[in-house]
Amino acid sequence: MDSVIISPGDYPKNVKNRRIKRLTNEELQIFKSYIDGLQPNARAVFWLLYGSGCRVGEAAHLRASDVTLRGKAVYIDIKDAKWGSDRCIPIIDKQAAEIVWKYRAELEIDNRPLFRISKRTIQGYATQFAQTTGISFHCHLLRHTFAALLTERGVPLTTVQYLLGHKSLGMTAHYAQSALVDMSPFLPEINLKNVEGED
């Protein structure tokens, strides 16, 4: 089994020792139904956040020319990112990729932001979702959920780190800790005859 060695220096500083929250499968279904009812630009940006794991600010600053089709995969080119984490990443979720590409294809390519929406407005929609549904939610929770879902699918932690634009592998590990990992392949099978009490 391949392993990734994380040294103590890789772990993020000043992070409280508590488990990172992520959206449950039920909450994700509610979230998807909710954003499908938003206006096209808001709908597309939230699908992008869910399907790519990018930061809110990164999504808000994308131009139409930053979204490209490579083969049958949709990629976003993130520039001037936090901590110098510029990167070109795919939209992992198929439905998200189709929605974002359709939205982008219907727009005229110019120098304006792709979604014509500010970071503050996106966060405002997130607040409305939380108030309407009663689900504890903020935009960054989508990055946590993205990391957890990829980890559950067996994507290497170093790949998740690149997709999220993390400087530290330890930060990625912190995000991915809410993954529901199936440990059954690694569990020993005991011989019940050796442990059952005698009659």
Regions found by a protein language model. Give the residues of each.
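Catalytic-site neighborhood detector that most strongly recognizes the C-terminal catalytic loop/helix
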Residues: 164, 169-189
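Basic, Lys/Arg- and aromatic-enriched nucleic-acid-binding interface segment
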Residues: 23-56
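Active-site/catalytic core of tyrosine-dependent DNA strand-transfer enzymes
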Residues: 28, 92-136
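DNA breakage-rejoining catalytic core of tyrosine-based enzymes
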Residues: 6-29, 83-94, 109-110
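Conserved tyrosine-mediated DNA breakage-rejoining catalytic core shared by Y-recombinases
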Residues: 61-99
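C-terminal secondary-structure termini that scaffold catalytic or DNA-interacting sites
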Residues: 1-11, 19, 190-199
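Short, charged phosphate-coordinating catalytic segments
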Residues: 49-72, 158
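Active-site-proximal segment of tyrosine recombinases
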Residues: 58-59, 137, 147, 154-168, ...
